[in-house]
Amino acid sequence: MLKNILLWSLQLSLLGMSLGGNVLIWPMEGSHWLNVKIIIDELLRKEHNVTVLVASGALFITPSVSPSLTFEIYPVPFGKEKIESVIKDFVLTWLENRPSPSTIWTFYKEMAKVIEEFHLVSRGICDGVLKNEKLMTKLQRGKFEVLLSDPVFPCGDIVALKLGIPFIYSLRFSPASTVEKHCGKVPFPPSYVPAILSELTDQMSFADRVRNFISYRMQDYMFETLWKQWDSYYSKALGRPTTLCETMGKAEIWLMRTYWDFEFPRPYLPNFEFVGGLHCKPAKPLPKEMEEFVQTSGEHGVVVFSLGSMVKNLTEEKANLIASALAQIPQKVLWRYKGKIPATLGSNTRLFDWIPQNDLLGHPKTRAFITHGGTNGIYEAIYHGIPMVGVPMFADQPDNIAHMKAKGAAVEVNMNTMTSADLLSAVRAVINEPFYKENAMRLSRIHHDQPVKPLDRAVFWIEFVMRHKGAKHLRVAAHDLSWFQYHSLDVIGFLLACMASAILLVIKCCLFVFQKIGKTXKKNKRD
């Protein structure tokens, strides 16, 4: 009996090993990496083998030791300070030139300089792999079954095609959804689908629709001009004429890091899966000292305040303005802040270099979340049903807060123009008016009421692609059409030609008949 049990256990063990696949991860930075790291951990839990490509100058990826996790480090001609510099320039450029109808061209010109620096770093990362024959040979022998990448960081798709394996994208957004629209072939009707970064909702006036239409066209132009240089790189790397967009279009699955608790209803394609909030989880107990501080709040509860990891500190004037507002509320405040201690800091506010944000938002005493509007933080607030005060600064943050405002779960204040009274009023509103808490809880219920959890859905589709060597049955035929075929311009041209020919024929016939009648009438008169 014992022998049979041991044999059965051994068979199950071997079966589990045989089911484990080999996954390759293309390097990425910032929140892009933090989200993929969650997926990696789940893949490891399910006994897959994961190899992460890591540039020697990587800023966020910290190699660790694990039996099923391998970090393949390769040299690049720059250090961590270079990536940190590009990120800093990106944030500052956006803060100083936040795009609006009046500043869009200035924003475009300044951002073009930053993106050019980003391209130089990206090319260094690409060359570090593609021109490293030893590494490429090792990857060829790795028997990988799928590659996971973020399209914001180019070349993961090139590596996948060179290895002859399918690839999957993990993506939050591209400006005005240009990548999803032109490369993924997702339709984005500007009449009711607001362009990402436009800060519009799906309820648009005529003026809003004009602005939305222009936003799409402007972002299309920016993508075409700023990313066009990659077409020649991709053609050279793959040894045939191609484009960045055409190659991106070969992705089997697009894992979109949002969901319908956040998005406005819009059309999508079957190979686009929504996995927003995949990093969210139930709250864990707080550190002892932090829990004691939270408990001193009594019935008033606490407010959590974080501007994310990208903003290291604020100007002294701005920090004092914020501290002054927070000192006037009865709630205790936990503020993630590394700068100089503000002179106006109230006794109810405590500063922390780092906070367990998810655990704090899930604490029963938390009443509000003051946030910069990053997608990860917003999803943790949605998960736990916490209303927000948005202080957006750059990238998708203003757009994210616009979504939460439209859904009644947030109030926005402008970081550049806000006064202490503005911030105080916003915090009091989300805490004291039931409207915001009710809507936050409604979004939370929607988020939790899914047939499959976001993380499980993401891993399922990765395993699906491994099992079936791709997901070609979900890929629309639009990828095989030229731009004029996609918009049916050839059909419209043909039908117009037919109509013109028919009209011309009718005119010719009428002229012929009139001529005959005229000749007959003249002949009768002569007779």
UniProtKB/Swiss-Prot annotation:
The chain crosses the membrane at residues 491-507. Pfam families: UDPGT (PF00201). Glycans are attached at N49, N313. It is an enzyme of class 2 (transferase). Coiled coil: none annotated. It is a single-pass type I membrane protein. GO terms for molecular function: glucuronosyltransferase activity. Residues 21-490 are extracellular. Olfactory epithelium. Mainly found in the sustentacular cells and to a lesser extent in Bowman's gland cells. Also expressed in the olfactory sensory neuron nuclei. Neuronal localization within the olfactory bulb is mainly found in the deeper granular cells. One of its GO terms (biological process) is response to toxic substance. Residues 508-527 are cytoplasmic. The keyword Membrane applies. Its main location: membrane. SUPFAM superfamilies: UDP-Glycosyltransferase/glycogen phosphorylase (SSF53756). UDP-glucuronosyltransferase (UGT) that catalyzes phase II biotransformation reactions in which lipophilic substrates are conjugated with glucuronic acid to increase the metabolite's water solubility, thereby facilitating excretion into either the urine or bile. Essential for the elimination and detoxification of drugs, xenobiotics and endogenous compounds. Catalyzes the glucuronidation of endogenous steroid hormones such as androgens (testosterones) and estrogens (estradiol and estriol). This is UDP-glucuronosyltransferase 2A1. The gene is Ugt2a1.
